[in-house]
């Protein structure tokens, strides 16, 4: 077990993620279940990993990440247009609804219904927090915890 967070550590944390307007987007404290972050496996943004490096058990840190260091900037390439006929099996979509779509490789990806205009439905596949500055409040609970098999 390492004494501080390293570039390949697994870290058990409590965190709260807030937006610029102060609303909480996500918090592990709400359900009392901490999150396991794995550094170095590309599941976290580089900006987030940089803020975790060197922290020790019991450390608390608060920091902000600009969009390009967090969930990215919205890409127009990730906005797709579908015919209403393609939604017949799923039922009538509603603006703001998040639906799962099957990608060409068979994986599923969430998309947000942004607009319904006649026979055309606009779906946004950008991360819901893309383009947002996010504010983290993180407490390190454990580094490289022994995981149950």
UniProtKB/Swiss-Prot annotation:
EC number: 5.2.1.8
GO terms, biological process: chaperone-mediated protein folding; protein refolding
Gene Ontology molecular function: peptidyl-prolyl cis-trans isomerase activity
Chemical reaction(s) catalysed: [protein]-peptidylproline (omega=180) = [protein]-peptidylproline (omega=0)
Keywords: Isomerase, Rotamase
One Gene Ontology term, aspect cellular component: cytosol
One Pfam family in the UniProt entry: FKBP_C
Domain PPIase FKBP-type: 2-72
Inhibition and activation profile: Reversibly inhibited by Ni(2+) ions.
UniProt record similarity statement: Belongs to the FKBP-type PPIase family.
Purpose: PPIases accelerate the folding of proteins. Substrate specificity investigated with 'Suc-Ala-Xaa-Pro-Phe-4-nitroanilide' where Xaa is the amino acid tested, was found to be Phe > Leu >> Ile > Lys = Ala > Trp > His >> Gln.
PANTHER family: FKBP-TYPE 16 KDA PEPTIDYL-PROLYL CIS-TRANS ISOMERASE, FKBP-TYPE PEPTIDYL-PROLYL CIS-TRANS ISOMERASE SLYD
Name the record gives this protein: FKBP-type 16 kDa peptidyl-prolyl cis-trans isomerase
Gene symbol of the encoding locus: fkpB
């Amino acid at each position: 077990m390492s004494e501080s967070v390293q570039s390949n550590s697994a870290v058990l944390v409590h965190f709260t993620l807030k937006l610029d307007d102060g609303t909480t987007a996500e918090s592990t404290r709400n359900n009392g279940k901490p999150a396991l972050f794995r550094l170095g496996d590309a599941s976290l943004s580089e900006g987030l990993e940089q803020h975790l490096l060197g922290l020790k058990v019991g450390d608390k840190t608060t920091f902000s990440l600009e969009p390009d260091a967090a969930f990215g900037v919205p890409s127009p390439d990730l906005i797709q247009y579908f015919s209403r006929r393609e939604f017949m099996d799923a039922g009538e979509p509603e603006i703001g609804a998040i639906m799962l779509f099957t990608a060409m490789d068979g994986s599923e990806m969430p998309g947000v219904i942004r607009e319904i205009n006649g026979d055309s439905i606009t779906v946004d596949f950008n991360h819901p927090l893309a383009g947002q500055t996010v504010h983290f409040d993180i407490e390190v609970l454990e580094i490289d915890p022994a995981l149950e098999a």
